[in-house]
């Protein structure tokens, strides 16, 4: 079943917040947070956070065929949000949730009005609220020629997939082609695919910008079902080191 909200009746800004979701993991490997009701509540809170704090269109794509519309506030601004849900979680669960998330992005490429009318997309794990997302937006506004904004670790071998931005062209022409490589059972996850696609993009002259500030996440890890420490005292020293590394890398 395909369901959605918003048929493209408004003008599309060039930037888009894209939230990925899976309300019912249905026994997904390496996913301790399995409770659909709790997951749905977290997705709703996240959607409300971005609607209330950022004047950008929001795309939410969910792959377990679990409709979320009836749970959203009745006064939600439907012109700014597109909701898509589809039956995309029926694959070998040993492949892992990253494989499913790749399928979500592929579904957006093929079916989303918002996605296909945007130039630059910020992909965020749907249950996570990035409390300092304004800093990511500001960086993107200053680096308009950049194709990818991402946080990379371990000598650039690992890319943080919870919050990253990329041009639609990079996502469609490079990134999505790494989908079928994702397989948690052999140790190749979404983050590996993202890092490899970035290296491929650099070879094709796509432009990379490392994220200046470390994202300050509010929410919990689906893998471990543990909450993030989003307190200022925890985030600030980590971010100071992160900004210093960013400055040194640009020299």
Name each model-derived stretch:
Residues 1-251:
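ER/Golgi luminal nucleotide-sugar-dependent glycosyltransferases, focusing on the catalytic module
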């Amino acid at each position: 079943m395909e369901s959605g909200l918003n048929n493209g009746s408004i003008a599309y800004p060039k930037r888009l917040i894209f939230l990925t979701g899976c309300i019912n993991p249905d026994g997904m490997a390496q996913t301790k947070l399995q409770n659909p009701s709790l997951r749905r509540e977290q997705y709703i809170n996240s959607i409300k956070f971005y609607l209330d704090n950022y004047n950008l269109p929001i795309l939410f794509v969910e792959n377990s065929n679990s409709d979320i519309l009836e749970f959203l506030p009745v006064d939600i601004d439907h012109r700014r949000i597109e909701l898509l849900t589809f039956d995309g979680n029926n694959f070998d669960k040993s492949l892992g949730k990253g494989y499913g998330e790749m399928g979500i992005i592929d579904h957006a490429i093929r079916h989303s009005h918002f996605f296909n009318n945007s130039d630059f997309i910020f992909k965020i794990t749907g249950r996570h609220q990035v409390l300092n997302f304004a800093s990511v937006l500001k960086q993107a506004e200053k680096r308009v020629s950049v194709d990818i904004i991402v946080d990379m670790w371990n000598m650039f071998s690992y890319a943080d997939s919870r919050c990253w931005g990329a041009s639609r062209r990079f996502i469609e022409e490079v990134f999505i082609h790494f989908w079928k490589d994702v397989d948690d059972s052999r140790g190749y996850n979404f983050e590996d695919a993202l890092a490899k696609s970035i290296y491929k993009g650099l070879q094709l002259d796509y432009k990379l910008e490392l994220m200046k500030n470390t994202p300050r996440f509010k929410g919990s890890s689906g893998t471990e079902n543990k909450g993030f420490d989003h307190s200022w005292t925890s985030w600030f020293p980590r971010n100071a080191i992160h900004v210093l590394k960013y400055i040194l890398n640009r020299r």
